[in-house]
UniProtKB/Swiss-Prot annotation:
The gene is ire-1. The modification Phosphoserine is found at residue 672. It is found in: Endoplasmic reticulum membrane. It is a single-pass type I membrane protein. Disruption phenotype: In combination with RNAi-mediated knockdown of atf-6, causes sluggish movement, arrested development at the L2 larval stage, and lethality soon thereafter; larvae have intestinal degeneration and develop many vacuoles in the intestinal cells. In combination with RNAi-mediated knockdown of pek-1, larvae have intestinal degeneration and develop many vacuoles in the intestinal cells. RNAi-mediated knockdown restores fertility, reduces the accumulation of unspliced tra-2 in the cytoplasm and suppresses germ line masculinization caused by RNAi-mediated knockdown of rnp-4/RBM8A. Keywords: ATP-binding, Endoplasmic reticulum, Glycoprotein, Hydrolase, Kinase, Membrane, Multifunctional enzyme, Nucleotide-binding, Phosphoprotein, Serine/threonine-protein kinase, Signal, Stress response, Transferase, Transmembrane, Transmembrane helix, Unfolded protein response. It comes from Caenorhabditis elegans. The active site is at 636 (proton acceptor). This is Serine/threonine-protein kinase/endoribonuclease ire-1. Residues 456-967 are cytoplasmic. Residues 781-909 form the KEN domain.
Length: 967
């Protein structure tokens, strides 16, 4: 109760002193006549973002009052040119140059270049610039632009209220750079800046602002209490903060931080012990903070809709920064390190941060010469020693006579010089000079009230702070730390989506969302457009975390959507979840032991893989067939995208299709994908089907072509059917390939036929995925023997001139190698003579012999069984090794019977659809021939003799005719 009483007393006295101060003469400005009902401009801050928007925010709540759209603060190229790439800073116009994939800071900024232009650098670069100033008046309540003043013209949109209109000055700087030796190298940029009064000291503003380097997040804290006052998301990077006053803009200080660093700050803002040391608020000397011990300066390289840019930002030790490659050993020996104990290192030295030095994981922009630019956080670059020499000199004054000698000053070098120190004009001194009486009255009243209230309310105040403190999402870096020390109340605040749960993150790992984390140092693979795959965990399960640059978020979402629909199949990689942060999208996928490329190239991988090579090929085809049945075209089939999973509890491994980033869905009612701007050329050189390059549309056969290349690559231990990589794509377009290395395989004829059908130049003549699965190359020994028996039964009673027999007996001498009796062993040859006669040149008789010996295998003599071997593998190998073309020949011949019930399991639907009109036509012709032959036989047959009956004469009529006069 006493604390409450004193609190009310404090508020009453504070209001009383404020009334006295306001009523004091001289407190109000002479020109101020705005009523009490109108909103004061001093409570409004303007936030400028890179897209050119000026947003008026309430300084107490962060609520957006109005928005004014202007030209973008920065416009710069998005392309990277070899040795001629510059990155401007939208905060102050400073410049960074990219050379040899390394960033350096130039000692001058865009405004300085414009003031010095035209000028020339010592590196042969020519600079030209221009400057345009403009004033525009706005209504501070609505943000409406009411008047524009410039040297060219003056436009008034509506009648200006001189009492309320505030004029803002804006300067547009345009700079162009040209290579003296190469006119093709040019660079242009436009930088807009607002004229503003500088606040004299940082501690005069009661708030401390933090802005994200890549997004428009703003966090605002009370400088004294450390309480977070408000947060706002403006969607675009913040470049400047201003206090809107009657006399114009007053620039406000703010810190730029990395997005992840701001998230870490949000996790600790209510921790009493860490808060003052982290941000330096509520400290004895606010100017002297411990930011240098907790955060590290870095350079953020980003890309907006208006071009590339670079902003210096503070990051913590968990943020990965890129460091330029070391080009060589140091020429001079460096100083000896200072010997420090481990305790001294922990106290005085900042923690080590992970730095990527050798492998650029996300090459976002790359030139043909190999120079690349990485988007993300870089070590703060060193300043170059580049200088520029102005070419303009002062014009002589009027007192100089014509023809007199003009003393020209030497050219000034604009380069890395010592920065000038400006005397700070304190904001408190401004108040003291302009309004001394209310200032002193307020100061004395506040001091007295603080002394009388703080000592009585100290304990209650501490308790109130402790009970109102909320802990956000907790990250435990040390799993061994006691649980009781880590337990705290959790909060739902924080605009970064921290979940109310606790996860343990191993040292060096990073968390994304509430369940997903990964190890940045454990890279499993890299892909195009900056894609990197890390080892990670999802909800305790080991997974592969695929990180995609946010610029390609469309592809990441499409990949996730397609995986959700297709990952139920055992041979499509499993998808778990997708998370995101400021720069990347993260996909949690099934963790695999190796890719098919690793299996072929690395022998140690083959030793750890228990699945057979032919099973890998068949399972990959099965996964692709599932995609095609789901109307999905993969478009990037290659050995790197066929993965082998970890062994299951039963020790089984699987082959799965992965990387759905380039997949496209065939729209309903269509059979192909048009090659427009959205589709583009998809795939990897050397594995792209020819129609992708020369046709306006593509479809499922593009995957079959790539799969055929993969089959040959796997069966030949790393050889490509279209030759070396240099001429590979040209050979693909021309249809020039060789399969000669398949001759070393036992099933060389089957492999040759399968791959040749998959690599056909005509897409419509290639096999479908189902036809590939039904090809005899993938049949087991049991299925092959059963097929031979079914064919023998089918043609046993057929006539010699029947269509199927004629097909089987075509080129029979080649199939049976001149005579199959000469190729079998003597024991089997002798046994065959005992029962019936076999024709040595007949494929049908060879199939009959195989069928009979299989059915009567146990009745065969011992020597014959030993020669044939066990059923099915050795028995089948006995015949196929002697007649390697037999299975393929019979398979092609009996396509005629693919529609019959017995043979449906051996052929795919597309084979039956292809053979149906052929069979129908053949049967129609045979039926017609039979009818014609029957008619011809009937016509040639002898006719039976016609039996005629003799005529019977009427004797009575004869008599009458012979005796007419009888009467």
């Amino acid at each position: 109760m006493r604390a409450t009483f004193h609190l009310f007393t404090f508020i009453f006295l504070l209001l009383f002193s404020s009334v006295i101060c306001i009523s004091t003469p001289g407190f109000r400005n002479d020109h101020e006549s705005i009523g009490d009902d109108e909103e004061k401009t001093s409570s409004t801050i303007l936030v400028s973002t890179i897209d050119g928007r000026l947003r008026a925010l309430d300084s107490e709540t962060g609520e957006i009052k109005w928005t004014l759209q202007e030209e973008p603060v920065l416009r710069s190229p998005s392309a990277v040119k070899q040795g001629f790439t510059f990155l401007p800073n939208p905060l102050d116009g400073s410049l960074y140059v990219l050379k040899n994939s390394s960033l350096k800071k130039l000692p001058f900024n865009i405004p300085q270049l414009v003031h010095a232009s035209p000028c020339k650098g010592n590196d042969g670069i020519l600079y030209a610039g221009s400057k345009k100033d403009v004033w525009f008046g706005i209504d501070p309540k609505t943000g409406l632009k009411v008047e524009t003043l410039s040297s060219a013209s003056a436009d008034r949109i509506c009648p200006a209220n001189q009492k309320q209109t505030i004029f803002l000055g804006r300067t547009e700087y345009r700079v162009s750079m040209f290579d003296e030796k190469n006119r093709g190298k040019t660079w242009n940029a436009t930088f807009n800046d607002y004229s503003a009064h500088l606040l004299p000291e940082v501690n005069t503003w009661p708030f401390k602002h933090y802005a994200s380097s890549s997004h428009g997040y703003i966090l605002t804290f009370d400088r004294e209490t450390g309480e977070m006052r408000w947060e706002q998301d403006l969607k675009q990077p913040v470049v400047a903060l201003y206090l809107l006053r009657d006399d114009g803009l007053h620039k406000l200080p703010f810190e730029v931080m990395g997005k992840e660093t701001m998230e870490n700050v949000a996790k600790n803002i209510f921790t009493v012990d860490q808060w003052p040391t982290v941000l330096g608020v509520n400290a004895a000397d606010p100017q002297t903070t411990s930011l240098t011990n907790q955060f590290f300066p870095a350079l953020f390289v980003g890309e907006s809709s208006f071009g590339l840019y670079a902003i210096e930002a503070l990051v913590d030790h968990q943020t990965i920064t890129y460091s330029p490659k070391l080009l060589g050993p140091p020429l001079l020996e460096g100083p000896a390190p200072i010997a420090l104990t481990e305790m001294e290192k922990e106290e005085y030295l900042p923690p080590r941060r992970p730095i990527i030095r050798n492998i650029p994981p996300s090459i976002t922009h790359k030139t043909s010469d190999g120079e690349y630019l990485l988007l993300g956080y870089h070590d703060r670059p060193m300043m170059t020693m580049a200088t520029i020499i102005p070419t303009r000199y002062p014009v002589p004054g009027p007192h100089k006579a014509i023809g007199s000698t003009i003393e020209r000053p030497p050219p000034q070098l604009l380069g890395p010089v010592e920065p000038q120190k400006h005397e700070d004009t304190s904001f408190i001194l401004l108040l003291l000079n302009n309004h001394p009486i209310p200032f002193y009255a307020t100061l004395v009243t506040m001091f007295a009230l603080l002394l009388t209230v703080i000592w009585q309310c100290g304990r209650q105040w501490d308790q109130q702070k402790s009970t109102s403190r909320m802990d956000s999402f907790e990250i435990v870096n040390n799993p061994g730390e006691s649980r009781s020390a880590q337990t705290s109340k959790q909060s739902n605040r924080g605009s970064f989506g921290w979940a109310n749960r606790k996860i343990e993150i191993p040292e060096g790992w990073m968390a994304v969302g509430s369940k997903l984390m990964y190890s940045p140092s454990d890279i499993l693979g890299t892909g195009c457009e900056g894609t990197v795959v890390y080892r990670g965990t999802f909800d305790g399960r080991e997974v592969a975390v695929k990180r995609v640059v946010s610029e390609f978020v469309k592809f990441a979402h499409r990949e996730a959507d397609l995986l959700r629909e297709s990952d139920t199949h055992p041979h499509v990689i499993r998808y778990f979840c997708m998370e995101s942060d400021s720069q990347f999208r993260y996909l949690a996928l099934e963790l695999c032991i190796a890719s098919l490329n690793d299996y072929v190239e690395q022998k140690e991988v083959q030793q750890n893989v228990t699945i057979a090579l032919r099973d890998i090929m068949k399972q990959a085809t099965d996964g692709l067939a599932h995609l095609h049945a789901s109307k999905i075209v993969h478009r990037d089939m290659k050995p790197q995208n066929v993965l082998i999973t970890m062994a299951s509890q039963r020790g089984e491994m699987r082959a799965v299709i992965s990387d759905f980033g380039l997949c496209k869905r065939v729209q309903p009612g269509k059979n192909s994908i048009s090659r427009g701007i959205a589709s583009g050329l998809a795939g990897t050189d050397g594995w792209i089907a020819p129609e992708v390059l020369i046709s306006a549309s593509t479809s499922y056969p593009v995957d079959i072509f790539s799969l055929g290349c993969i089959f040959y690559y796997v069966l030949t231990s790393g050889t490509h059917p279209f030759g070396k990589s240099l001429h590979r794509q040209a050979n693909i377009v021309n249809g020039e390939y060789t399969l000669n290395k398949l001759a070393d395989l036992d099933d060389w004829s089957l492999a040759d036929d399968l791959i040749s059908s998959m690599l056909n130049v005509e897409p419509l003549h290639r096999l479908t995925a189902d036809a590939v699965l039904n090809h005899p190359f993938f049949w087991t020994s049991e299925k092959r023997l059963a097929y031979f028996s079914d064919v023998s039964d089918r043609v046993e009673k057929e006539e010699d001139n029947s269509p199927v027999v004629r097909r089987i007996e075509t080129d029979a001498r080649i199939v049976v190698c001149g005579g199959w009796r000469e190729k079998i062993c003597d024991a089997l040859k002798e046994d065959l003579r005992k029962f019936r006669t076999y024709k040595s040149f007949s494929v049908r008789d060879l199939l009959r012999a195989m069928r009979n010996k299989k059915h009567h295998y146990r009745e065969l003599p011992e020597d014959v069984r030993q020669s044939l071997g066990d059923i099915p593998d050795q028995f089948l190998h006995y015949f196929t090794s002697r007649f390697p073309r037999l299975l393929l020949h019979v398979y092609k011949a009996t396509e005629y019977c693919s529609g019959e019930a017995v043979f449906k399991r051996y052929y795919s639907d597309d084979v039956r659809a292809r053979m149906y009109p052929i069979v129908e036509e053949e049967e129609r012709v045979r039926k017609k021939i039979k009818e014609e032959m029957a008619n011809e036989v009937w016509a040639r047959a002898p006719k039976p003799v016609e039996q005629r009956t003799p005529l019977k004469l009427d004797k009575r009529n004869i008599k009458k005719k012979s005796n007419p006069n009888t009467d």
